[in-house]
């Protein structure tokens, strides 16, 4: 730990005695670093040690004298005068010499001396920083208000009244501010400061930003410090770059940042972009990250992404050698076969270092279980593909391995890869067809595989089945509807929504193509299945009915009374509850999801960004849930007392059933939002409720194979005594 770090720790902890002791030691340094001394003094100034240090601040003067001329030397002197409390002749002489040398002959020079206390020398603490501030107070210069008014432009100054007139970006009218208040709340900004350019010349800065994206980000980081991608967007979007152009502009900027060396990119969206003062080579940045990494798996990931994103760097022989050495020097446990394999794959497949450890003999020595375990512990998809290519080339059981991945992987990229490999092997085609047809007969066995292949088949991208074979298409379509019905209330319900989105997309194009020339029995079954799928709205069902009628006009005679079923009955309590749920989805969850997407997008490389993909999938789910719920609310009708009739069984009725042995069962029939089977409240759409609808007193109802007579029909309002 160097002096700066040690002193900062002591300042933060308020250890005055230890600080003064270490400071005394620091003062004996032969070499003084101006930037380091500035940081120490600024830390002291903002701490509880400021008044104590002010009594010995004269010890800084010899250090100040050793600093070369420049900004750091001027800043150290300002801080000395800010901290001093003695107002001694030595400090007075140093201060007056400084202002005479820097500002003599400037307008209002003598008035400024009087304002800061350098005319009479009685109290001139803060004199230099305040004098610099007053010399900055010229019309057209810029300041920043620390109290929330933002950037301001100086419109006028009066030394007689000791006031300055400033127009702020966040205030409607210009403000008169006294010098005393200005000293405490305003910070001067140079003309080339990011905030000055953004406020003073927005059109010119926008044009500059569009032509020079990386330079603008550098200016922002230089003047405002390290920023995350989200914070960079907050500073630029609409204020510099129009929101409509933001995504394209930011993607371009990130690409250039990645190729450049002045800005160090973060490893995840929550970390900031940092401007490197001296610039750091790509290899230097990688070496820094490798030095901070705590485990070999993370180091392998860093090296892989370096090779992938900056492949042109490999033309440099020294860089290639450094990467090889970094991989060979990795501390990998002998038993960690997966990490060893990943390292060897990077060396052989990406860096051209052929190693005998992953030759034909090694691949053939692996069992099927060994191969699966190695893949499970290999997070980088590209390395998985490289390994599988070797398995395909040398292993006798490659088909089994590839088929298992096809069935169980959650990565669409990997599923596409193994599917194409199997499909391109003539001896495996029939096995592949059989497996996919099995998935159509039992889609719940491998739900993700079924949905993935159904979409591929519907788009004629499978390259396996004859696109003219409508029977295969219809088999999968029928299975898709069964699947949608089965998954509606399971953890796989999002897959059902995905199928629904596909089937109704492009004006039901997939459905129209699949049912072309279909038989009447098939279409009847299709329409029946569609009514069981909760994902389909009433308008969807109407469209499906119309599409089927185009293929088989006789279906018009069998047209179900969809219009009568269109109403969704609800109690007023459930209606209010569902409206509140919709408002929560639209007002909170969608906003939170938008933030998740932006945070995940911010790194720019979306190819293997799982967080970004998950956030997009969540957005699609939320949008679909909002669409379905909005449609249901539009169809909803609140059940009232005058709408319930007890001459026959209908919605809003409580039905008493009596068996042959005298046993009594009671059911209440309400809409789907109010259904509660545990309390014997049936949904109007349930099979049992449908069997009872329209029946009258003494009519027979079959329940679990037994006959029951309807002994009583009453309104739910009679039950409540209303």
Curated annotation (Swiss-Prot):
Region called GREA, residue ranges: 565-722
Superkingdom field: Bacteria
UniProt entry keywords in alphabetical sequence: Coiled coil, DNA-binding, Transcription, Transcription regulation
GO molecular function: DNA binding; RNA polymerase binding
InterPro entries, alphabetized: GreA/GreB_C_sf, TF_GreA/GreB_CS, Tscrpt_elong_fac_GreA, Tscrpt_elong_fac_GreA/B, Tscrpt_elong_fac_GreA/B_C, Tscrpt_elong_fac_GreA/B_fam, Tscrpt_elong_fac_GreA/B_N, Tscrpt_elong_fac_GreA/B_N_sf
One Pfam family from the record: GreA_GreB
PANTHER family, per database record: TRANSCRIPTION ELONGATION FACTOR GREA
Stated name of the protein: Transcription elongation factor GreA
Source organism: Chlamydia pneumoniae (Chlamydophila pneumoniae)
UniProt gene name: greA
């Amino acid at each position: 730990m160097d002096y700066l770090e040690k002193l900062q720790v002591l300042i933060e902890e308020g250890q005055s005695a230890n600080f003064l002791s270490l400071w005394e030691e620091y003062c004996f340094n032969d070499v003084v670093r101006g930037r380091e001394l500035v940081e120490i003094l600024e830390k002291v100034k903002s701490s509880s040690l400021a008044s104590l240090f002010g009594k010995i601040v004269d010890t800084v003067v010899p250090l100040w004298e050793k600093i070369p001329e420049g900004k750091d030397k001027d800043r150290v002197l300002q801080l000395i005068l800010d901290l001093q409390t003695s107002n001694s002749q030595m400090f007075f002489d140093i201060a007056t010499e400084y202002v005479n040398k820097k500002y003599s002959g400037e307008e209002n020079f003598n008035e400024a001396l009087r304002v800061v206390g350098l005319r009479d020398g009685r109290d001139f603490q803060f004199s230099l920083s305040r004098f610099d501030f007053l010399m900055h107070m010229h019309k057209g210069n810029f300041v920043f208000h620390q109290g929330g008014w933002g950037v301001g432009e100086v419109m006028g100054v009066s030394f007689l009244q000791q006031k300055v007139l400033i127009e702020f970006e966040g205030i409607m009218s210009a403000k008169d501010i006294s010098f005393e208040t200005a000293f405490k709340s305003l910070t001067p900004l140079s003309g080339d400061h990011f905030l000055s350019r953004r406020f003073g010349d927005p059109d010119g800065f926008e044009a500059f930003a569009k032509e020079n994206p990386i330079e603008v980000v550098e200016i922002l980081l230089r003047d405002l410090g390290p920023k995350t991608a989200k914070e960079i967007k907050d500073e630029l979007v609409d204020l510099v770059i129009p929101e409509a152009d933001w995504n394209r502009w930011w993607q371009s900027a990130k690409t250039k940042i990645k190729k450049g060396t002045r800005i160090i990119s973060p490893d995840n969206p929550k970390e900031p972009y940092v401007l490197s003062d001296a610039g750091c080579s790509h290899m230097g940045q990688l070496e820094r990250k490798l030095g901070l990494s705590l485990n070999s798996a993370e180091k392998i990931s860093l090296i892989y992404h370096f090779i992938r994103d900056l492949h042109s760097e490999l033309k440099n022989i020294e860089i290639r050698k450094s990467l090889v050495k970094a991989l060979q020097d990795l501390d990998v446990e002998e038993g960690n076969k997966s990490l060893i394999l990943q390292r060897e794959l990077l060396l052989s497949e990406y860096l051209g270092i052929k190693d005998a450890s992953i030759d034909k003999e090694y691949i053939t020595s692996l069992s099927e279980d060994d191969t699966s375990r190695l893949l499970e512990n290999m997070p980088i998809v590209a390395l998985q593909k490289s390994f599988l290519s070797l398995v395909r080339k040398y292993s006798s059981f490659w088909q089994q391995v590839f088929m298992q991945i096809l069935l169980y992987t959650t990565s669409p990229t990997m599923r596409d890869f193994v599917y194409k490999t199997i499909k391109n092997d003539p001896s495996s085609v029939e096995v592949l067809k059989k497996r996919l047809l099995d998935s159509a007969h039992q889609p719940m066995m491998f739900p993700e595989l079924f949905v993935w292949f159904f979409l591929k088949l519907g788009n004629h991208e499978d390259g396996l089945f004859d696109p003219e074979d409508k029977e295969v298409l219809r088999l999968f379509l029928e299975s898709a509807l069964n699947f949608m019905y089965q998954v509606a209330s399971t953890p796989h319900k999002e897959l059902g929504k995905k199928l629904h989105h596909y089937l109704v997309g492009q004006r039901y194009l997939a459905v129209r193509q699949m049912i072309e020339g279909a038989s009447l029995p098939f279409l009847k079954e299709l329409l029946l299945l569609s009514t069981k799928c909760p994902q389909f709205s009433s308008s969807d069902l109407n469209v499906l009915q119309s599409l089927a009628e185009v293929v088989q006009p006789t279906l018009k005679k069998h047209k179900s009374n969809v219009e009568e079923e269109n109403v969704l009955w609800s109690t007023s309590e459930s209606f209010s509850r569902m409206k509140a749920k919709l408002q929560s989805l639209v007002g909170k969850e969608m906003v939170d999801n938008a933030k998740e997407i932006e945070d995940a997008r911010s790194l720019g490389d979306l190819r293997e960004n799982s967080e970004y993909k998950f956030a997009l999938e969540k957005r699609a789910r939320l949008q679909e849930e909002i669409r379905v719920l909005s449609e249901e609310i539009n169809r909803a009708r609140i059940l009232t007392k005058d709408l319930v009739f007890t001459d026959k069984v209908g919605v809003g009725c409580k039905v008493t059933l009596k068996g042959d042995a005298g046993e009594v069962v009671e059911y209440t029939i309400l809409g789907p939002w109010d259904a509660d089977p545990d309390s014997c409240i049936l949904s109007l759409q349930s099979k049992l409720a449908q069997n009872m609808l329209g029946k009258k007193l003494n009519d027979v109802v079959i329940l679990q194979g037994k006959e029951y007579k309807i002994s009583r029909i009453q309104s739910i309002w009679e039950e409540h005594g209303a």
